[in-house]
């Protein structure tokens, strides 16, 4: 996962 999707998956 990238730094963008890291909070979207959280």
Swiss-Prot record:
Top enzyme class: hydrolase
MF (Gene Ontology): beta-agarase activity
EC number per UniProt: 3.2.1.81
Cell compartments where the protein resides: Secreted
Keyword annotations from UniProtKB, A to Z: Glycosidase, Hydrolase, Secreted
Coarse class of the protein's main subcellular location: secreted
One of the GO biological process terms: carbohydrate catabolic process
Keyword Mitochondrion annotated: no
Enzymatic reactions: Hydrolysis of (1->4)-beta-D-galactosidic linkages in agarose, giving the tetramer as the predominant product
Domain of life of the source: Bacteria
pH note: Optimum pH is 8.0. Active from pH 6.0 to 10.0.
Assigned GO CC terms: extracellular region
Temperature dependence: Optimum temperature is 40 degrees Celsius. Active at temperatures up to 50 degrees Celsius.
Annotated family: Belongs to the glycosyl hydrolase 16 family.
Record-given protein name: Beta-agarase AgaA34
Organism: Agarivorans albus
Lineage: Bacteria, Pseudomonadati, Pseudomonadota, Gammaproteobacteria, Alteromonadales
